[in-house]
Amino acid sequence: MSYYDDDHEMFRSSLRGWLAMNVVPNIDQWEADGIVPRQLFADAGSQGFLGMAIAEEFGGGGIDDFRFNHIWAEELAYAAAGGSGAGFPLHVDVLVPYFTEFCNDEQKARWLPGIASGELITAVAMTEPGTGSDLA
């Protein structure tokens, strides 16, 4: 029994092709440079890969189905691109839900379109002075 339907498999096929063309050939250079070009996020956003769970009114796919996030993880692993430093899982899995669940409508209108399009790249900054995790 598959947990994925035809829509998931179409997403997988598109994402796999996009990763093969846009990420895999560049991984070594990005690792050496220690940076991924901002344009990569814009390219991913233009393909609809960054905002599946973001409401359509804010530029997303309007599909609240975590299986798409799981496909992201599978395809990054398949492409051996999980360590590319691009931060797609952080953007898609961790931070989008903060914005979709905890922002008011004005904040959603301000931030979600850019997050879905890749114009804005999300990040997390944490500190636990003197205790806790060493996030470095």
Regions found by a protein language model. Give the residues of each.
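A non-catalytic, amphipathic alpha-helix used as a structural packing/dimerization or gating element
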Residues: 7-21
